[in-house]
């Protein structure tokens, strides 16, 4: 490792390049075979035009995006860090959307400025390396306590804890195995590490104000169920924990808005939800330690969609936009052989053969432990290509073989035409294959490396004693 401000020798790579062991190793390496011209030219045959349906496009869009940053407390002691997570929520309504676009691929800057009035940003401040919060004993406990407090403070009504993100988390956790609407099970106590065996299960009950471990008596927090505290370290960077937390919070916020609408508009929630679509930056998936919550979101949306269908309404509209990755690379490779306006529901077979080149595919389905949405590939009417994700219309993945087949059957997704129409409408020229909702959400949430992060560094230094 270099000293601070020490620069590397500009010719130090020569020893590596000329090392005979390295040369021999590189000679044995070979790339995974590329798609041949026939594979590329025939790929477009799998695409088709989406079927029309009787559902209308929504007038309201909620776009959610987040970013995180680890700020150093002192220049002299850069290993003392505070974590910042910012998740922005933008509400775009029919009139504002038409004003932004103005019939052009270029956005109207004056209309964009007005959108700021409907922008809501949620900030989470979490202790990271070498920082202890309140009366906690170490960084891990500090992270847990701070996260739980901030989930509780994020409320729609300040005097009603039932409107908090924490209550939404409890409801989602109740869908986990061994849990119900009155109690949830945590994987293990963060202090004594008991709870993993059948005879020492640890529950947190709905009305517990200050739950404690029955084995060691230490304080537990509802947010412990997310397990994002597990990789938190005292003396190393905690960017992994911050990233996992941001990922699950973005998706949990969408569910929180849905729950709020359902519970506060008991007579008209179906009409409201039918006229609303959530845009989420990234796939509909939960990664890392909280991954099991993908199944909770899947079950909740399935149950709600059953009610929506009984009322002759569209399924909940939620779309994850994937801006990069292997599927995007594949789509860009074959896009010239796809007609404008055509869409494809990606199967595991095609993914394994042409995207991941997995010749020994497992019996499990792609994203079994993480995804609650299906990948679609689309070339819009302007010729731009998008990889997007929509919720699975199934309750669970228990019958893997059947799920693997049915998830890639486009006929199971009743509102694909709505999604493709939205991708036509919101296409903009600000970035390559950019969409207005995701661009705006990122605009108001991104913590830029400078000057945004510099401000957070200064804030951390001035507030911590």
Could you say what each language-model-derived stretch is?
Residues 54, 67-69:
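Alpha-helical structural signal
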Residues 60-67:
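Two-metal-ion RNase H-like nuclease active-site motif
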Residues 1-59, 113-465:
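Long, contiguous domain-sized segments
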Residues 72-131:
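Acidic, metal-ligating active-site segments
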């Amino acid at each position: 490792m270099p000293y601070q401000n020490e620069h590397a020798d500009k010719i130090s790579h020569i020893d590596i390049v000329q090392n005979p062991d390295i040369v021999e190793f590189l000679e044995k390496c070979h790339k995974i075979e590329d798609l041949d011209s026939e594979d590329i030219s025939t790929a477009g045959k799998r695409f088709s035009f989406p079927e029309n349906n009787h559902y209308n496009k929504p007038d309201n869009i909620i776009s959610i995006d987040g970013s995180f940053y680890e700020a150093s407390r002192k220049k002299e002691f850069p290993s003392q860090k505070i974590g910042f997570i910012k998740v922005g929520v933008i509400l775009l309504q029919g009139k504002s959307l038409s004003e932004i676009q103005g019939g052009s691929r270029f956005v109207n800057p004056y209309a964009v400025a007005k959108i700021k009035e409907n922008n809501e940003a949620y900030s989470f401040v979490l202790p990271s390396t070498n920082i202890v919060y309140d009366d906690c004993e170490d960084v891990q406990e500090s992270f847990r306590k701070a996260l739980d407090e901030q989930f509780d403070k994020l409320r729609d009504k300040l005097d009603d804890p039932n409107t908090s993100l924490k209550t939404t988390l409890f409801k989602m956790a109740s869908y986990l195995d061994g849990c119900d609407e009155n109690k949830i099970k945590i994987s293990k106590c963060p202090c004594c590490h008991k709870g993993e065996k059948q005879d020492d299960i640890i529950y947190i009950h709905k009305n517990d104000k200050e739950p404690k471990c029955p084995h060691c008596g230490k304080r537990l927090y509802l947010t412990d169920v997310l397990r994002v505290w597990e990789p938190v370290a005292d003396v190393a960077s905690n960017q992994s924990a911050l990233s996992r937390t941001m990922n699950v919070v973005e998706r949990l916020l969408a569910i929180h808005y849905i729950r709020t609408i359902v519970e506060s508009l008991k007579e008209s929630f179906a009409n409201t939800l039918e006229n609303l679509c959530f845009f989420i930056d990234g796939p509909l998936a939960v990664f890392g330690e909280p991954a099991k919550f993908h199944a909770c979101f899947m079950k909740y949306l399935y149950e709600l969609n059953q009610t929506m269908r009984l009322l002759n309404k569209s399924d909940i509209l939620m779309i994850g936009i994937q801006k990069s990755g292997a599927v995007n690379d594949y789509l860009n490779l074959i896009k010239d052989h796809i007609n404008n306006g055509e869409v494809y529901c990606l199967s595991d077979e095609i993914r394994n053969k042409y995207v991941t080149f997995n010749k020994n595919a497992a019996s499990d389905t792609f994203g079994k432990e993480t995804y609650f949405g299906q990948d679609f590939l689309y070339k819009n009417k302007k010729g731009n290509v998008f990889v997007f994700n929509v919720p699975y219309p199934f309750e669970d993945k228990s019958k893997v073989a059947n799920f693997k087949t049915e998830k890639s059957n486009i006929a199971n997704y009743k509102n694909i035409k709505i999604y493709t129409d939205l991708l036509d409408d919101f296409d903009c020229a600000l970035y390559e294959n950019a969409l207005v909702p995701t661009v705006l959400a990122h605009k108001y949430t991104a913590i830029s490396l400078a000057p945004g992060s510099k401000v957070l560094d200064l804030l951390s230094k001035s507030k911590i004693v």
